[in-house]
């Protein structure tokens, strides 16, 4: 039976199109990237407060087909060859073969909120979400199957006991079509080495005694993986997921909501609350704050949510209130704008 616990931080919408080295995703235009990640305004998700008791009573049901699926809340997007694939609320997954001009709804076996999507190659992709769901596609996102669901949801729950909370997964990353990782609430860290046929709980591989949430995982070119979470926690893996080191000289103690490598070796950026963004050129040994100014030359104070690296090396980060940041110099500096429809 699951141990009761309280939420410490809200789960936030994010987009992750970052990768590195041999894992770099195929390029796409900046306009298509912006359109994909800004669908439905990219609003932050509210604090997740669904009780596991309520969730357990709901059978797994397929997502409802709707002509409006592409206009609902979509919180992450990825590239599968020349196709864009976006995931979001109510189990909605949509894909576009014309750089975001039109969208088609995929066949999805669940209705829960999906928080992240990642493709290891042109065909094989994984999406994660609430109820610790992990979905897989082998046809570039047109059809999906469920590979994993939190096994504790199927355990009997004492109706007289305290309310229990679910553990959503917040991000997913794959080294290749076989080895990948899914991360999420309360220090959840899952690993597969068979393309998701089986998933092993490897949360004990990371030193996280307080069970802080993990929000983002990204590859850093020429270096390894970076894992970012709440309370300023950062972890790195120089062997791409086999071993993990806790970073102790942290630049900030608020929650991180996103992370991205760049096209340069050892360079990684992380971002979070109130416009806080930091950049490291040595895989996390040292950090420098990135100065972000609004068009009026005031400090940016919007919470930064998701971001991605395009095929041409341009880095885009989006935030609350329609804020869009773009960098063409590997994250040294950013142009800041606010979407006109959000002003």
Residue spans of the language-model regions?
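Residue-level hotspots at or immediately adjacent to binding/recognition sites across diverse folds
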Residues: 37, 51-343
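N-terminal secretory signal peptides that target proteins for export/translocation
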Residues: 1-28
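Gram-negative bacterial Sec-dependent N-terminal signal peptides
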Residues: 18-49
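N-terminal processing/targeting junctions
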Residues: 8, 13-17, 36-39, 45, ...
């Amino acid at each position: 039976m699951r141990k009761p616990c309280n939420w410490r931080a809200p789960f936030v919408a994010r987009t992750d199109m970052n990768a590195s080295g041999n894992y770099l995703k195929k390029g796409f235009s900046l306009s298509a990237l912006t359109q994909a990640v800004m669908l439905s305004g990219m609003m932050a998700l509210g604090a997740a407060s669904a009780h596991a008791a309520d969730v357990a009573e709901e059978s797994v049901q397929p997502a409802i087909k709707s002509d409006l699926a592409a206009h609902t809340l979509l919180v992450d997007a990825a590239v599968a060859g020349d196709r864009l694939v976006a995931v979001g609320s109510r189990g909605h997954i949509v894909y576009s073969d014309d750089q975001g001009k039109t969208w088609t709804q995929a066949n999805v076996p669940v209705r829960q909120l999906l928080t992240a999507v990642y493709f290891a190659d042109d065909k094989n992709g994984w999406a994660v979400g609430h109820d610790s769901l992990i979905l897989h596609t082998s046809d570039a996102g047109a059809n999906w199957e469920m590979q994993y669901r939190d096994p504790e949801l199927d355990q009997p729950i004492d109706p007289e006991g305290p309310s229990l909370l679910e553990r959503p997964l917040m991000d997913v990353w794959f080294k290749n079509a076989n080895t990948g990782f899914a991360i999420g609430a309360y220090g959840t860290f899952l690993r597969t080495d068979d393309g998701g046929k089986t998933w092993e709980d490897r949360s004990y591989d990371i030193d996280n005694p307080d069970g802080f949430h993990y929000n983002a995982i990204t590859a850093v070119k020429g270096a390894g993986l970076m894992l970012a979470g709440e309370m300023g926690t950062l972890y790195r893996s120089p062997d791409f997921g086999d071993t993990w080191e806790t970073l102790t000289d942290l630049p900030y103690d608020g929650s991180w909501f996103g992370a991205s490598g760049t096209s340069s070796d050892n360079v990684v950026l992380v971002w979070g609350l109130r416009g806080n963004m930091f950049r490291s050129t040595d895989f996390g040994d040292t950090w420098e704050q990135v100065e972000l100014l609004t068009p009026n030359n005031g400090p940016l104070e919007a919470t930064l949510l998701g971001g991605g690296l395009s095929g041409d090396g341009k880095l885009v980060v989006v935030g609350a209130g329609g804020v869009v940041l773009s960098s063409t110099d590997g994250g040294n500096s950013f142009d800041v704008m606010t979407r006109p429809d959000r002003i």
